[in-house]
Amino acid sequence: MGIGLIILYLLIGLLAYDFTKKNKKISKNDPKQPLAIPVLGHLHLFGSQPHRSLTELAKKFGGIFTLWMGDERSMVITDPNILRELYVKNHLNFYNRASSESIRIYSGNLVDISFSVGESWKNRRRYVSAALTKTKVLNVITLIEEQANFLINSMQYYAKSGEPFFPHKYYNKYTMNIVMSIGFSKTISENESVEEGPISQLIIPFYNILENLGSGNLGDYVWYTQPFFYFKNKKLEQDTKKVYTFLEEIYNEHIKNLDESNPRDLMDQLIISTGGKEKDMVIHVSTDFLLAGSDTNASTLEWFCIFLANNPEIQKKAYEELISVVGKDCKAVTTKYRDDCPYLVGAIKETLRMRTPAPLSLIRVSEEDFMTSGGIFIPKGTQIVPNLYGIGQNFVDDPSSYKPERWVEYYKNKTPTREMEATTETKSNITTEILPNDLDKVVLPFSIGPRNCPGNIISEINLFLACSNILLNFEFSNGGKKIDETEVFGITIHPKDFSIQLKKRE
């Protein structure tokens, strides 16, 4: 028998073994799963928009189903009750993140807050929560209001000239400045571009990291393909090093000028709380803060403008509500008006539902074998993929329609009595005990449980001040041609490049 034939038989045997392993039930309580193929498992089903593909699969296979991501057994959660059971009631078994070669490179071998595990994560979360709490809220609001004013000023030119306004770089600068101001007292000046000047040493490699992590890496899921991704990982390593070096200089400045009685920003707070002994952690947490706080909010602002430009009647209604609250002579909207603008707030929340910034969040791992209250068995080591986008789609009426009024009606009708009620409904083959259209429980842009987004309050202020002041100052339109609402998948989902026409409000 020739060596070639032996290799062929071995290959066929390995493929047969892999096929059997990935399709064999390990208990009678296994969730459903589609047929897996050797090597890839179910990766071929993800397509270019995995969040949409998984949402459709949930309608067929249920609110929890198994998928093999290459070598990794995974379970996709598209049921708010199951997600709450795992992430809230049993969070100690599900708070660790999944790791991979790409993640280890980005996180400095898991020393950040996004991907650290076990006691390390608990310590980092405690430091960050304390630092955010001690960062004075009024100071934060003042910083955001200032940046919102800079944003409006930068948009005025396009309203006067009639030139198309491409919002991407302006919204990114707005959100990046907020994060850098709060994080380490740095900003991009009003006349400086994101891609130019000293700050570009941070921004350009930072965006490269986002693109690298968002594009996926087969080597993270099929171990023997890792050599083919050597150069991609090397590029990620180089960009991560550039970001680290830039932030290290800022860290050293903070150490040199530290006044423990008067901390200036989040980095000062972290240095004080760690006694200046956790340099790597502080720098990598700062990188996380940039990632979570800038890109997600910038993309949400873009989607907000797209939906209101494509739905001028909704824009008109939101503007009329805003003017009725702040008055026509108002120069700048502040946070004090937020509670009096339910329709505008509903438009922002509906944007987060329709285009959840991180639709599949970050993958976690089951620390031990676990049986859900519904009798589904989750083996130790299983990856948990929370389909936040799918939950916000499959548990509301008319999910593909942009309806801010659903939020207005929801909060108007929400009472403590209704909050305590529980019904069981089967919708799209997904069983839920949560009330139909219980929006606060099925729209989860910041995730849930102890490992949710620690900066969600800052994010909400950020979005309200930007959206309200843009609406106050400009009527924006799609120029008579509907803007493409198809998203581009990544760590955060973005719209395709687009422009809007701005008209100064009278």
UniProtKB/Swiss-Prot annotation:
Keyword S-adenosyl-L-methionine: no
Keyword Transmembrane helix attached: yes
Compartment annotation: Membrane
Enzyme class: oxidoreductase
Membrane topology summary: Single-pass membrane protein
This protein's GO CC annotations: membrane
Membrane-spanning segments: 1-21
GO annotation, biological process: response to imidacloprid
Annotated positions binding heme: C453
Record CDD domains: CYP1_2-like
GO terms, molecular function: heme binding; iron ion binding; monooxygenase activity; oxidoreductase activity, acting on paired donors, with incorporation or reduction of molecular oxygen
Alphabetical keyword list: Heme, Iron, Membrane, Metal-binding, Monooxygenase, Oxidoreductase, Transmembrane, Transmembrane helix
Primary location recorded for the protein, binned into one broad class: membrane
Domain of life: Eukaryota
Required cofactor names: heme
Protein EC: 1.14.-.-
Family the UniProt entry places it in: Belongs to the cytochrome P450 family.
Protein name per Swiss-Prot or TrEMBL: Probable cytochrome P450 519E1
